[in-house]
Every structure is written in structure tokens, then in C-alpha cells.
Amino acid sequence: ITTPIIMSLLESNLPIERLVVMVQKEVALRMVAKPGTKDYGALSVAVQYYTEPDIVLDVPPKSFLPAPAVTSSVIRCVLRDKPPVDVIDEKLFFRVVKAGFAQRRKTFANTMKTTGLSKDRIEELLAKANIDGQRRGETFTLQEFADVANAWAALIK
């Protein structure tokens, strides 16, 4: 339930400057995760696209009655004036991100098949973006996801 609420707030275009929430520590770690780490995923990319997140503090289970089985974290997300990467089509960007994490153990070229693109088209856009399709999506930076999305946008113009 946490992820849909956070994403709804981030995508809402409400006039907010920052979002401060308490979430399970594992969710907070996913929100601030860097490429190539086990916690890095689509949530990391989305939160970091819209905000500059940082974990403010951890809240131990004993702080609550009854005590939950997990540690919580307070995370501050300062909304960006503009995303850190230039994207031609934001929906296409998030479609590429979703594909990149659809099957974590597969190569990016294989996970891109979930978009409905042909193998030849995938190879074409990866070449245009100068991306090695044999890498896994969880190693991609925001810029690399943007490069693939922008290459795709250019191919469908």
C-alpha cells in the first residue's frame, strides 16, 4: 500500500515542496537505493526522478505499542524543480523502467520484450542509446533509462 500512495503523491503535481513520511525501513532503503544494489528497483528510479530523497532517522519497533516486527524509517523527499534527466516522453521513460525491472535476472534486451517491441527494434534502440543490452536493468542509472526511452521516442516519431 505504501508504494501506490507515494507514487500517487509524486505524480499528482500538487504544489508541495517536500514529502516527509514514515515507512518500513526496507521501503525507505528501496527509495534511496543506488544502481547495482539489491534494493534498487523501479521505486528507486521513480522517487529519485521526482525527488531528492534521504533517510532522516530510523524508528525502532519499541517506539510503538504494540511493537511491530519491523523497524520504520522517516524519509524526506524534496521535490525537484525539474527531473535530473531530460526525457522526451515521461510515460515512455517509465515504461522502459518498468520493463527493466520486470524480470530481474534477465538481461535488459530480454526484459524489453515485455514492451511488445521486436528483437530487431530493441537492438536498434539499444544501439542508438549506446547501451549494452546484455546488462541487467538493475545496473542502469536514471540517465541510461532516459537514453533508452529517448532513443525509442526518436524511433517512433
Give residue spans per PLM region.
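Class I S-adenosyl-L-methionine
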Residues: 1-137, 147-157
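Interdomain hinge/lid region at the active-site interface
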Residues: 144
